[in-house]
From Swiss-Prot:
Gene3D superfamilies: Exonuclease VII, small subunit. Belongs to the XseB family. It is an enzyme of class 3 (hydrolase). The lineage of its organism: Bacteria, Pseudomonadati, Chlorobiota, Chlorobiia, Chlorobiales. Keywords: Cytoplasm, Exonuclease, Hydrolase, Nuclease. Its EC number is 3.1.11.6. The gene is xseB. This is Exodeoxyribonuclease 7 small subunit.
Length: 95
């Protein structure tokens, strides 16, 4: 049976699935009915997922730099966009 993107047999989640889970975790932590212990467990899971997302984004960036180094030499930033130190931290770049 051929594997399709909709019927993946791999246990490795896509980055979109990781982000979806992070959003779910955020909603649960923000819910006042979520207990402290559960919030801590959710926070730990979220930090782990965020690190996995960061690693995958860095891998993707490296692939893009290999494909077209001239286009990825400097991060694209819209004109008059505010500085985002969090994005710089995420990718390990400077503005």
């Amino acid at each position: 049976m051929p594997a399709s993107s909709k019927s993946r047999t791999s246990a490795v989640p896509t980055i979109e699935e990781l982000i979806q889970r992070l959003e779910e975790i955020t909603r649960n932590i923000e819910n006042p009915d979520t207990g402290l212990e559960n919030s801590i467990a959710l926070y730990e899971e979220g930090m782990s997922l965020a690190e996995e997302c960061r690693k995958r984004l860095l891998e993707t960036r490296k692939k893009l730099e290999t494909i077209n180094p001239a286009e990825t030499a400097r991060p694209a930033k819209p004109e008059n966009a505010p500085e985002s130190p969090r994005m710089n931290d995420l990718f390990g770049t400077e503005s």
